[in-house]
């Protein structure tokens, strides 16, 4: 069934600037996976599995491919189309006590609302490089949000 999802959409020309690490980049000496870092929340399946965090935001995909990272529990389920922050996802950042947020769609940009609303220190994967721990200022996050464009995305659910 097709659903209209209200979103804030990342403009194509904005993608390049957000592909640059937005915090401290950690790389393992052998260019393998990085393990054991601490943050308030993790965005991404592999990162969520390999680090100590209070909240996990996952979509069962890594590099756009389905991945099995073991049994997952979901306190909150949100719909978030690729390259967007859905209003549903933004609202989920306000829910206190959730330890696991499962995303139908893509979780990559959800670093933004969780940093803005909760001031979280967030860890996320930097593809083929390592992991980033980010705790940007409220001003930086608001600047990014101002660059997003309101839209409606039709998604088959």
Swiss-Prot record:
InterPro entries per record: GTP-dep_dephospho-CoA_kin (IPR007164)
Residues where GTP binds: 40, 59, 61, 107, 128
EC number: 2.7.1.237
Transmembrane segments: none
UniProt record, GO biological process: coenzyme A biosynthetic process
Pathway named in the protein's UniProt entry: Cofactor biosynthesis; coenzyme A biosynthesis
Catalytic activity: 3'-dephospho-CoA + GTP = GDP + CoA + H(+)
UniProt entry tagged with the keyword rRNA-binding: no
One Pfam match: DUF359
Gene Ontology MF annotations: GTP binding; kinase activity
Function of the protein: Catalyzes the GTP-dependent phosphorylation of the 3'-hydroxyl group of dephosphocoenzyme A to form coenzyme A (CoA).
Protein name per its UniProtKB record: GTP-dependent dephospho-CoA kinase
UniProt organism field: Desulfurococcus amylolyticus (strain DSM 18924 / JCM 16383 / VKM B-2413 / 1221n)
